[in-house]
Amino acid sequence: MSCPVIELTQQLIRRPSLSPDDAGCQALLIERLQAIGFTVERMDFADTQNFWAWRGQGETLAFAGHTDVVPPGDADRWINPPFEPTIRDGMLFGRGAADMKGSLAAMVVAAERFVAQHPNHAGRLAFLITSDEEASAHNGTVKVVEALMARNERLDYCLVGEPSSIEVVGDVVKNGRRGSLTCNLTIHGVQGHVAYPHLADNPVHRAAPFLNELVAIEWDQGNEFFPATSMQIANIQAGTGSNNVIPGELFVQFNFRFSTELTDEMIKAQVLALLEKHQLRYTVDWWLSGQPFLTARGKLVDAVVNAVEHYNEIKPQLLTTGGTSDGRFIARMGAQVVELGPVNATIHKINECVNAADLQLLARMYQRIMEQLVA
């Protein structure tokens, strides 16, 4: 299949960019962007490669994405080696095909076509690319955003190419994401012999009423954009492995995916009040990996919806479901942020694949978004 989007996607897949190793992907993208007049600024932090590229001036539309991928798992279970892109029955197989090297290729080809047709475009077109989204994400988009904010860089609109679609490309557009807050809680007791409970203090027994009340809380009812806040216990650990020792500590890890009805401080206050109510001795550590954000109907959402309707003749759903993305960092700049990408049915799985025709369609959608906002 001869298509610039497919060919570039295949070139990217051949580079085994296991997070945070870029494996040469960004050099390939930079070469293409510089060829059409983009200024490129590399912004590497520690082991992570990032770049910020721009062309033109004024109102700014950025396309954001990541070159890194998750490990392929058992390569023998793939129908073809995971880093050897193969097209079968119209599907392009390879690690990163959907998440998100196909989107990156579609963005770059869309930019090439857009610049060819609008060499003197009115606004500024930009790219924010990182090699660490799948792993810690500590030195990726968040660091670039901090650097851009420190120098008052302008960013009005941002299109993140994460695989947002469910069945056909564009059927779901993410115009926001829930916040994510993790609590690492240790309940302290006194270790002892199970035959002498009066000489010990069992933290599991003490914590049970607290945990029972915690899981029963209705945090909020959500709103028209967000589902209700969810709390899930992810890990519980206690004991020595022996059946005759009362443990001295209980470790509980739980995560909140929260809506704009709450703040992380409100959640923390309610959890701490509950711990005090049950008179527990504890230490607690919080990790906020992202605040909730929402892009309401406006120029970016309208442009994305228009592009999907024009090329796929469907009306996309605007949703905020799913995990976190780098959009949570970019939203701090005050930009309107929307995610539009290919079907996500096989991401992170054995035999990850994407419909080759969808990538061609996606490039057309991206180009139309550029034309509506910065032409």
UniProtKB/Swiss-Prot annotation:
SUPFAM superfamilies: Bacterial exopeptidase dimerisation domain, Zn-dependent exopeptidases. Binds 2 Zn(2+) or Co(2+) ions per subunit. GO terms for biological process: diaminopimelate biosynthetic process; L-arginine biosynthetic process; lysine biosynthetic process via diaminopimelate. GO terms for molecular function: acetylornithine deacetylase activity; cobalt ion binding; succinyl-diaminopimelate desuccinylase activity; zinc ion binding. Its cofactor is Zn(2+); Co(2+). Keywords: Amino-acid biosynthesis, Cobalt, Diaminopimelate biosynthesis, Hydrolase, Lysine biosynthesis, Metal-binding, Zinc. This is Succinyl-diaminopimelate desuccinylase. It comes from Escherichia coli O7:K1 (strain IAI39 / ExPEC).
